[in-house]
């Protein structure tokens, strides 16, 4: 019964997180530059993992965010005040039976998480954002129905090349460094270094093919990049203000103090979990009445991939 459940949120190492996460998700467990916090969420009565959360520095390009703020934000302010949810993945069947994705999201939107990040990184987080998994190819998301804690603010711009997986990026980056006199293409202290390095790699490849007169290869390479960009669907972007009413003005530097909304205390972790419990109880009761409760744990194995009906 969800009303009897209790949860603990703990940060864990990359090694432990990745080893567990790959059992329940098809997502690559890549790092992103900047902040990285990996939470394991455990149900303490049963000592079982309910889900995984990885938070990190926000992406640079976001049309919905820019529209909401009224401009392209200063990167220093963006990194100081925004945090992004990269993994919000419930273990199954907890996610299906109890709306586990909503629980994990409420934890992300809680003051517990905000204060944790503030203490760890010496920042003043006042905004959380994440994007839907399936993009505009699917009309619903685990983040729907979470107002006022989380709101849809629009569709991300699809004209954007994703960064390479860590393994391939590391190998290619080493190749370029070796041929650049041991020097990195982008300075080590640069922001969004991985994205900038990848962009530089692409520019060098194009220039090299052009200078060697390899017109056909250049055309093929350009077509490949265009295709990679085209594979991206627009995704719904979601935003939480942690119960502050003047986040936009604060991030834009128009005020130096955050103002609490009347519902500010609702974002405390205990209250956030209680909000979820009511939703989860209704979900569980409906599934139970229909005989649709799931009992089997879903993990990724070579012999059961066809039996798992969703991609996380």
Language model: regions and residue ranges:
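Long, compositionally biased intrinsically disordered regions
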Residues: 40, 174-312
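Long, hydrophobic/aromatic-enriched structural stretches that serve as scaffold segments
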Residues: 21-23
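Short Gly/Pro-enriched turn/cap motifs at secondary-structure boundaries
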Residues: 29-30
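Conserved N-terminal entry element of GNAT/NAT acetyltransferase domains
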Residues: 1-11
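Acyl-donor binding region in acyl/amide transferases
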Residues: 14-17, 26, 35-37, 43-183, ...
